[in-house]
Structures are given as structure tokens and as C-alpha cells.
Amino acid sequence: MQLSYKLRKVFTGDAVTSARRHVKQWFLGRAPLRFDAAKITKTVDPEKFRAIYERYGVEDPGDHWPKYLDLQTWMEINLKRVRDLGLDLGGRKRVLDIGCGTGYFLYICQYLGHDVLGMDLDVEPGFTEMVELLGVKRVIYRIEAFEPLPDLGRKFDVITAHMICFNGHKSDKLWTSAEWEFFLDDLAEHQLEPGGQICLELNREYDDSLYTPELKEYSEARGAEIHTQRIHFNPLLPAPAATATTAR
């Protein structure tokens, strides 16, 4: 293994994640399932995917949604997310992915035998077609500040949100710890199984920041481990009393 890769693992927190995976493997007495992104990609109907690509694919999509039609790349990215959460180890979980997009993350989870549900807006026909192609269940809902999520009929062991935009991303309404507190408390009370985990992945703002010092401090006070853009609660701790009083 190259030295540069080892150093990158240390400084991004990947070393901690890797160590925990090894401990969990030892505790469970099993190795992770042997599969890779290429193997999973081959399970997607090539003719149906090609038809979607021909409708929406562009040579240089930039930051626009057709970039997600680079199937192999995004399968690799989402497989890493799955492994970082230990979803390739242990038993069957219920997984909710908020802002599920094309559904790749949930497709891999479903491939591993997990019970999955996505949540997103219905604004990009290409996302809808990909979710349908992958056979991923999805509910349509717009997340708003200080508004609870709908009753989904069950609770989840793992709740994720990748490349988040619902937090007022790149606007003058970027969420503070008060909005995040309402959101997290709502998840904890109505959507999350006791002891479940929440993993949030933030996008960079115009100033290239991922979160304010206030949000970082608040998240860590609730038990989060922060690795670059990823804020991982495992488990989520109650809100600090001072913040809870202020938010209300």
C-alpha cells in the first residue's frame, strides 16, 4: 500500500473507519461479503440503462444531474458509503436514504438483503426512471425547516442523507443548529430505531465551507464523528440542554 494512501486515510478519518470494520468483523466472526462495484453494476439491465443514458446523457455534465449516469463511478462511491456504515456486515437492516437521487446507495443495500426506502423530490424524470429501473422504493416529500417527516409506517436502523441540499444549501437560508436540532430530534423520535445510526453528508457552500464552527461543535456534542463532509451519529445523543432551550 502506498505511503500517500496511508497518510490520506489517517487525515480523513478512514483509518478509524477501517479499524472499526476489522473489529466488527472479528466480533461477528465473519468476513465482509466478497463483491465489488463492477459485479453490482452488471446486475443492472444494460438495455434499459442504455435507453435512459441516450435520453439524458451528455458528454460533459459538469455538476448537473446527468453526471450520475457514470454508472461505474457512482456505484464505487456508493459501495464505499455502504462499507463505511458496515452495511456489508451483520444482519438485515432497515435503511432510509433521504435525497436518494438515482437510488444507487439503496440499490447496493437492497442487493445485500436490506429493507430499503428512499425519499426525494419528483423533479428530475431521469432520477425517477433510474429508481424504477433499480427497483428501489421511494416516497416523494420535500423537507422543510422545522417540519417533521411524514409517517413512513416503520422505523429504521440506518438513516442517511448524501450530498445534502435540503438544508438551504447555497442560499441565505442555510440551516443553523436550531434547524438541525429539530430535524435530528424528529428522526430520533419518529423514524430511528433505538440505537440506530444517522449519517449526513454535506455539500460545500459558496465559500467552500462544509459547516460552521457552531454546527461542528453542536454535532460533536450529540456524539457525531466528523470526517470531512460526513457527520456520523452512532448513536445520536440527546441535544445539549442549553441549545435545546434556545431552539425552543
Question: Where are the predicted features?
Answer:
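Conserved alpha-helix/loop element of class I SAM-dependent methyltransferases that forms part
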Residues: 71-92
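Conserved SAM-binding loop of SAM-dependent methyltransferases across substrates and taxa
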Residues: 102-112
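A short SAM/SAH-binding and catalytic strip from SAM-dependent methyltransferases
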Residues: 157-177
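Class I SAM-dependent methyltransferase SAM/SAH-binding core
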Residues: 110-137, 144-145
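A short glycine-rich, Lys/Arg-flanked "PGG" loop and its adjoining helix->strand segment in the class I
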Residues: 174-194
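Conserved class I S-adenosyl-L-methionine
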Residues: 92-101
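Conserved beta-strand signature within the Rossmann-like core of class I S-adenosyl-L-methionine
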Residues: 194-202
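A short acidic, Gly/Pro-enriched loop at the edge of an enzyme's catalytic core
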Residues: 149-158
